[in-house]
UniProtKB/Swiss-Prot annotation:
Function: E3 ubiquitin-protein and E3 SUMO-protein ligase that acts as a regulator of innate immunity. Acts as a negative regulator of type I interferon IFN-beta production by catalyzing 'Lys-48'-linked polyubiquitination of AZI2/NAP1, leading to its degradation. Mediates 'Lys-48'-linked polyubiquitination and proteasomal degradation of the critical TLR adapter TICAM1, inhibiting TLR3-mediated type I interferon signaling.
Zinc finger regions, RING-type: 12-59
Gene: TRIM38
Protein name: E3 ubiquitin-protein ligase TRIM38
Top-level taxon: Eukaryota
PROSITE patterns noted in UniProt: B302_SPRY (PS50188), ZF_BBOX (PS50119), ZF_RING_1 (PS00518), ZF_RING_2 (PS50089)
Length: 460
């Protein structure tokens, strides 16, 4: 039911009913449109030509032109009418003061006594309202929990979308990088095979042309002998018999040596389909032998005699304090340096739980802890507790479906490319953005506890 104050605001002070087509005058008071117009007309009849009128409530002056529809008040009146209609029993016209629990309906006192609600549990509206308000609040609490859960799921789904897009982008870059690497390799292989084919062509052609030249020379000799014999046959008897035995002897002594037998079978044969799908073969064409440089080893690193294996252990004594030695981190460099060309080497990481692998500039800092990023002269990847990352700035997460037991590292010095491969599966791991190398590059390793590294020889 509408409050007393609401009803007072919606009641016209002229007709004392809820306003119809409420309008306001300049002082702010409102009236029914019909009532205030009738008020004007009555005053005009008493005082013809009157232009200014006094508000029936506050006596403030106003004019007819100041009338304005009061939509807000009109809306309030409609609400009050609906409330009045809802709060009255449609059957009996009585106020709905009771609530039937069995039917879940508002009823009046006559309904309560009728046959329809006989024996039903009823309560005063105020009492029933309090109980149901608590239940509604409980329902609101539950729905808010569901709303919060829904929002959390929405956030989770948005994160999944982001992660999925990142995964797709990573895979896209990986595919593009793999094909670029493959295209470079195929281009180099094409040039290599064409060069070999051209070389084989020239070698065989040179021998064939030698045969051709020898046969040409022999043909001239035969033609000379034939001409000599034909001239004798066509001459006089005395001329024919002159030195005839010597001429015959020389003629019968002429032999035709067979040219060098040459096979026309091609030795330079390229199976493009095999090249295309054999990544391991592709990389190992550039494989170099890498050993460890003991003069760069951190004092906790222990090398094998052949300098192909390193493990982290107790600090080594009696080591010199060379500026070439890593003193801040347990790192070591490969003995070999690269200043041009393509190079590939492998590192057997086994079941190790941590390692850094890659290449670095010859002049990197070795006595201070610093980020091992390309900006500092390092191009390396890492395995740690969190998984696999490329040492970029910021770090780049690497998602691998299979754990590499052997990691292949490929360097194209002129192209500025450093790539990493899982040689357990032959799949690409990561390629750094193109760089410009200005210094000698050397293989780089950081050794973790219980994670030895082994550099297999190229023929293994």
């Amino acid at each position: 039911m509408a409050s007393k104050k609401m009803r007072e605001e919606a009641t016209c002070s002229i007709c004392l009913h809820l306003m119809t087509n409420a309008v306001s005058i300049s002082c702010g008071h409102s009236y029914c449109h019909v009532c205030i117009v009738s008020f004007f007309e009555n005053l005009n009849r008493m005082t013809p030509g009157l232009k200014t009128f006094s508000c029936p409530q506050c006596r403030a002056p106003f004019t007819m032109a100041s009338l304005r529809p009061n939509k807000q008040l009109g809306n309030l009146i409609e609400v009050i009418k609906e409330m009045d209609q809802e709060m009255s029993c449609e059957e009996h016209g009585e106020k709905l003061h009771l609530f039937c629990e069995d039917e879940g309906q508002l009823i009046c006192w006559l309904c309560d006594r009728g046959a329809q609600h006989k024996g039903h549990a009823t309560a005063l509206v105020e009492e029933a309202c309090q109980g149901y308000k608590e239940k509604l609040q409980q329902a609101v609490t539950k729905l808010r929990q569901l709303e919060e859960e829904c929002m959390n799921l929405k956030v989770f789904t948005a994160e999944q979308i982001t992660k999925w897009n990142e995964k797709i982008e990573f895979q896209k870059q990986k595919i593009q990088s793999d094909f670029k690497t493959l295209q470079r390799f195929l281009h180099e292989e094409e040039k290599s095979y064409l060069w070999k084919l051209e070389k084989e062509k020239e070698q065989t052609l040179r021998r064939l042309r030698d045969n051709e030249a020898n046969l040409e020379q022999k043909n001239h000799e035969l033609q000379s002998h034939i001409l000599e014999l034909e001239n004798k046959c066509q001459g006089s008897a005395q001329k024919l018999l002159q030195d005839v035995k010597d001429t015959l002897s020389r003629s019968w002594a002429v032999k035709l040596e067979q040219p060098e037998a040459l096979s026309l079978d091609l030795h330079t044969v390229c199976n493009v389909s095999e090249l295309y799908f054999d990544v391991k073969k592709m990389l190992r064409r550039h494989q170099v032998s890498v050993t460890l440089d003991p003069e760069t080893a951190h004092y906790e690193l222990i090398l094998s005699e052949d300098r192909r294996q390193v493990i982290r252990g107790c600090p080594q004594e009696n080591l010199d304090n060379s500026s070439r030695r890593f003193s801040a981190l347990p790192c070591i460099l490969g003995y070999e340096g690269f200043t041009s060309g393509k190079h590939y080497f492998e590192v057997d990481v086994g079941e190790g739980t941590g390692w850094d692998l890659g290449v670095c500039m010859e002049n990197v800092q070795r006595d201070t802890v610093m980020p091992q990023t390309p900006q500092s002269g390092f191009w390396a990847i890492r395995r740690c507790k969190e998984g696999y990352v490329a040492l970029t700035s910021p770090l780049t997460s690497i998602h691998l479906t299979e754990k590499p037991l052997v990691v292949g590292i490929f360097l194209d010095f002129e192209a500025g490319v450093v790539s990493f491969y899982n040689m357990t599966t032959g799949s690409h791991i990561f390629t750094f953005p193109k760089a410009s190398f200005s210094d000698t590059l050397r293989p780089y390793f950081q050794v973790y506890l219980y994670s030895p590294l082994f550099l297999p020889p190229p023929d293994e």
